[in-house]
A protein has these predicted regions:
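Cytosolic ends of transmembrane helices, especially the final helix of ABC transmembrane type-1 domains
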Residues: 1-11
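ABC-type nucleotide-binding domain
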Residues: 13, 18-273
Length: 273
């Protein structure tokens, strides 16, 4: 009991490390969605996770990130909403260092859906509309449809009023991922970050989701971590990470021509090509 009580006290008195600077930019208008990494190095302790990373993403582009487990993909995307700070270099959104932006304003315009999904103990409706109690039922269904979730939700006895999360019904990994994607889309983000979000869905559902993402009714920069070539081949730019460094960068055709890591993955997923 005492150990649990001490843990509660520790959490209660904890203070966030990442906070707004006194000179933080107050920008209430919608972001365009330009993202730039400029000489970014990031460490966990003494371990270098990202090593002098440089790239630019123009607003509205789709960029895919690939690499082996532990190559730094998730750490990279977590720097954009400033979950961590870089050790050196800059992460810029619309030309402004994220350290100089107000956290609430930055994060409110970044939608994230990850492989490991957290669902709140609430209705499906409440999970999708999380943070916006005024969202209409029509809008909730719209984003569920974009994420290929509407069909399985409507088959449930209580539909969108079904309770999920710790005290709710059990959902498959693919169903959870689709609800997480619907929640990320529902805020109409200027920047959408997907971390292996379709890893647990079948190929047909993945294709449906890709079509939805290509035809969103709002401007959006999309950054997608994926292991399937089917998820990356149509991206405007593909970034290959290896041990925290960018080893390849270009379009699908350009990387196939280089015959490096991307080409080997392509061959493997296409039965030797």
């Amino acid at each position: 009991f005492m150990a649990s009580a001490m843990k509660v006290i520790e959490i209660y008195y904890a203070r966030p490390i990442i906070t707004d600077r006194e000179d933080a930019v107050d920008q209430t208008e919608r972001l365009h969605g330009d993202v730039e990494f400029k000489d970014v190095t990031f460490k966990f302790g003494k371990h270098i996770v990202l090593d002098n990373v440089n790239f630019k993403i123009k607003a509205g582009q789709t960029v895919a990130i690939m690499g082996e487990t532990g190559s730094g993909k998730t750490s990279l995307i977590n720097l954009i909403p400033r979950f961590y700070d870089t050790n050196s270099g800059e992460v810029l959104v619309d030309g402004v260092n994220v350290r100089k932006r107000k956290l609430s304003q930055l994060r409110s315009q970044i939608g994230m859906a990850t492989q490991d999904v957290l669902l709140f103990s609430d209705t499906i409706d409440g999970n999708i509309a999380y943070g916006d109690s005024d969202m209409s039922e029509e809008d909730v269904k719209h984003y569920a449809k974009l994420a290929a979730a509407n069909e399985f939700v409507e088959k449930m006895p209580d539909g969108y009023e079904t309770i999920v999360g710790e005290r709710g019904v059990g959902l498959s990994g693919g169903q959870k991922q689709r609800l997480s994607l619907a929640r990320a889309l529902a805020i109409k983000p200027a920047i959408l970050i997907l971390d292996d979000t379709t890893s647990a869905v079948d190929m047909e559902t993945e294709k449906y989701i890709q079509d939805s993402l290509r035809n969103l009714d709002f401007p959006c920069t999309k950054i997608i971590i994926a292991q399937r070539i089917s998820s990356t081949k149509d991206a405007d730019m593909i970034i290959i990470l290896d041990d925290g460094k960018i080893t390849e960068m270009g379009t699908h055709d350009e990387l196939i021509a280089k015959k490096g890591y991307y080409y080997e993955v392509f061959k493997l997923q296409n039965d030797g090509f």
